[in-house]
From Swiss-Prot:
Protein name: Polyribonucleotide nucleotidyltransferase
Family to which this protein belongs: Belongs to the polyribonucleotide nucleotidyltransferase family.
Entry-linked CDD domains: KH-I_PNPase, RNase_PH_PNPase_1, RNase_PH_PNPase_2, S1_PNPase
Swiss-Prot/TrEMBL GO biological process terms: mRNA catabolic process; RNA processing
Protein's organism: Rhodopseudomonas palustris (strain TIE-1)
Domain (S1 motif) ranges: 623-691
Start-end of Basic and acidic residues biased regions: 701-713
Gene of this entry: pnp
Length: 722
């Protein structure tokens, strides 16, 4: 019934198995990949004919995690998986980025890659396995894919690189780096690092590239057994059109790309394009070519002219040389009521970044395959259409916004203070108000400034820079702080963030083969110079965290109570803690280990809440004096609430010095009194005294009364002796 083919290798000390022919047989390509006991299914389906009216690759990649893979039932009312989580979106992008450049030029058939996690062993993260499975499924599918690719995760523990560290090891690593590529080229890098050097980062990339070669070999072995016949792809020769167009518009296009202002440049390029279209589509004549084809050739010509200019003259679109960073202006404290804010402007790219400090109530609960955990640092990136002078629909967060936000998150996360030292939930929002390249790195710079403006004690200021590359044969140019056009028309997008000490995040997307280790080394070195320059410009606004939190930020005090007292502080159904919050105005969060966090923007509220909680959580001490309230008057004495929720009895004989006829002669309900804890009777009832305490000053009179009594006893004895 099944025509099963499989390959198995040992990879990083665990078995990796790729199998096809048993599951999802109606897909063009389907591979079940197993690593340890983590299992994913990758499928590829491509439409039989090209999609009409498009001049791009219509590829969609979806990665999905099923709760059953970890033996869990989804939360929520419907108890089924809902919209993609942040992790699913990020892994979808992780798969997409290295495979997209490898589709043959001109492939316009709708192509969908779906990767589903079927089993998770809580040791091996499914993301790298998903990339491998998708590569294998594409290689088998028959679509024109110039793969396969391999992928690997690299850690750095005890000064050594570790291949595919298990989840438990990730807590110890100084580096989490995912790298993907072909047999002879690196195509994609995504990473977070604890201020590591350029040499260590480059070494990790090359280590990963070497160690996923056996995976590529295994996919090729499987393809030799089970690959489908390659799809036919008609390659159209546009050389004659390009030659004609070059003679028509080359000089005007070169002049347009010498205009430094983005909007003016786009307008000039638009006019040149109109001229080309008018030439190839004269009015009243039957057109010889399809409009999309002409537009595609024009786009290719744009890229060539920009690239030629840079390589021939060393000058870029806006007149800079390859190493110069655009003009920078950094400002902090730009919004009056926020906890921290910054406006970071670099050329025609601008980010307004705002930091908000919250409490434990504001932590994000993340439901993942490995369980639910709390996230205390959030960074959100928004890219409204006005930032590029366009109109557009505002709706849900797009994949690109999630990806850019996570990149900035990775850049900042390593320099944040430990949560036990700075127990705030931190949310940073980057609003991109202008964009002409490198908006994610502007978000990193703005986030660092906004956090320091809010008083968050970062280890060091952090900055980011986007690098580009133009490669033609033996000639190449590495570009610092790229423009949007240089990003689109170049061969590499290379984003580096970090401090003066080292790199905290590295993201790389390479569109062509042939980028050597030496070129990457040059790019990293040039990026370091640019990063140090940007940090210097940022320091003109703020070079360290403010000594005090923002005026409107909450203050948090942390202390511990015995775990057996947590129930008393919370009360039945949360009654006690709700009363504390309502009456003091402070927010209270109690963790399972007895850690209590009390937060408020008002210091008196915090003091009141702490005093209340401590009075409940600790036991009163015999001999201590407390202030209390008379809650009930009886014939034999008065009950006084004196220690949180604790009441005690002041017997009538302990109300006042001398004989008391009626309790009500001395106290009534609601009176504020000072009492001394005498002890506990045989039944554990609390015994209090008022008469041994000065009700005005709170002074302990018992010692004084004993001294007086002793003195009175000695006087008659002396008289008798005389």
């Amino acid at each position: 019934m099944f025509n099963i083919h499989s390959v198995e290798i040992d990879w990083g000390g665990r078995p990796l198995k790729l199998e096809t022919g048993k599951v999802a047989r109606q897909a063009d390509g389907a591979v079940v990949a197993t690593y340890g006991e983590t299992v994913v299914l990758a499928t590829v389906v491509a439409a039989k004919s090209p999609r009409e009216g498009v001049d791009f690759l219509p590829l969609t990649v979806d990665y999905q995690e099923k709760a059953y893979a970890a033996g869990r039932i989804p939360g929520g009312y419907f108890k089924r998986e809902g919209r993609p989580t942040e992790k699913e979106t990020l892994v979808s992008r992780l798969i997409d980025r290295p495979i997209r450049p490898l589709f043959a030029d001109g492939w316009r058939n709708e192509t969908q890659v779906i990767v589903t996690v079927l089993s998770h062993d809580m040791e091996n993260d499914p993301d790298v396995l998903a990339m491998v499975a998708a590569s294998a499924a594409l290689t088998l599918s028959g679509v024109p894919f110039k793969g396969p690719i391999g992928a690997a995760r690299v850690g750095f523990i005890n000064d050594e690189y570790v291949l595919n560290p298990v989840l438990d090891e990730m807590a110890e690593t100084q580096l989490e780096l995912v790298v993907a590529g072909t047999a002879d080229a690196v195509l994609m890098v995504e990473s977070e690092a604890k201020e590591l050097s350029e040499e260590i980062m480059l070494g990790a990339v090359m280590f990963g590239h070497r160690h996923f070669q056996p995976v590529i070999d295994a996919i090729i072995d499987l393809a030799e057994k089970a690959a489908k016949e390659p799809r036919e792809l008609t390659v159209v020769d546009d050389s004659e059109i390009e030659k004609e167009m070059l003679g028509l518009v080359e000089q005007e296009l070169r002049a347009a790309y010498a205009i430094p202002v983005k909007q003016d440049r786009y307008a000039a390029v638009g006019k040149v394009k109109e001229k080309a279209i008018a030439h190839f589509f004269p009015e009243g004549q039957e057109p010889k070519y399809d409009k999309l084809r002409i537009a595609g050739v024009f786009k290719e010509l744009e890229a060539k002219i920009v690239r030629w200019n840079i390589l021939d003259t060393g000058k870029r679109i806006d007149g800079r040389d390859s190493k110069t960073v655009r003009n920078i202006l950094a400002q902090v404290g730009v919004l009056p009521r926020t906890h921290g804010s910054a406006l970071f402007t670099r050329g025609e790219t601008q980010a307004l970044v705002v930091t908000t400090l919250g409490t434990g109530e504001d932590e994000q609960y993340v439901d993942s395959l490995s369980g639910t955990y709390k996230e205390t640092f959030l960074l959100h990136y928004n890219f409204p259409p006005y930032s590029v002078g366009e109109t557009g629909r505002l709706g849900g967060t797009k994949r690109r916004e999630i990806g850019h936000g996570k990149l900035a998150w990775r850049a900042i996360h390593p320099v944040l203070p430990p949560h036990h030292e700075f127990p705030y939930t931190i949310r940073v929002v980057s609003e991109i108000t202008e964009s002409n390249g490198s908006s994610s790195m502007a978000s990193v710079c703005g986030a660092s400034l906004a956090l320091m403006d809010a008083g968050v004690p970062l280890k060091r200021p952090t900055a980011g820079i986007a690098m580009g590359l133009i490669l033609e044969g033996e000639r190449f140019a590495v570009l610092s702080d790229i423009l949007g056009d240089e990003d689109h028309l170049g061969d590499m997008d290379f984003k580096v963030a970090g401090t003066e000490q080292g790199i905290t995040s590295l993201q790389m997307d390479i569109k062509i083969a042939g980028i050597t280790e030496e070129i990457m080394k040059v790019a990293l070195g040039q990026a370091k110079d640019g990063r140090i320059h940007i940090l210097g410009e940022m320091s003109k606004a703020l070079d360290r965290a403010r000594a005090e939190l923002g005026e409107h930020a909450p203050r948090i005090e942390t202390f511990k109570i015995p775990t057996d007292k947590i129930r008393e502080v919370i009360g039945t159904g949360g009654k006690v803690i709700r009363e504390i919050v309502e009456k003091t105005g402070a927010k209270v969060n109690i963790e399972d280990d007895g850690t209590v966090k009390v937060a408020s923007s008002d210091g008196e509220s915090i003091k009141a809440a702490i005093k209340w909680i401590k009075s409940i959580a600790s036991d009163p001490e015999i001999g201590e004096i407390y202030e209390g309230t008379v809650v009930k008057v009886m014939e034999f004495g008065a009950f006084v609430n004196f220690f949180g929720a604790k009441d005690g009895l002041v017997h009538i004989s302990q109300l006042a010095a001398g004989r008391v006829q009626k309790t009500s002669d001395v106290v009534k309900e609601g009176d504020k009194v000072k009492v001394k804890l005498l002890g506990f009777d045989d039944r554990g009832k609390t015994r209090l005294s008022m008469k041994v305490v000065d009700q005005t000053t709170g002074e302990d009179l018992e010692a004084k009364q004993k001294a007086e009594a002793k003195a009175e006893g000695e006087a008659p004895a002396q008289a008798a002796g005389e």
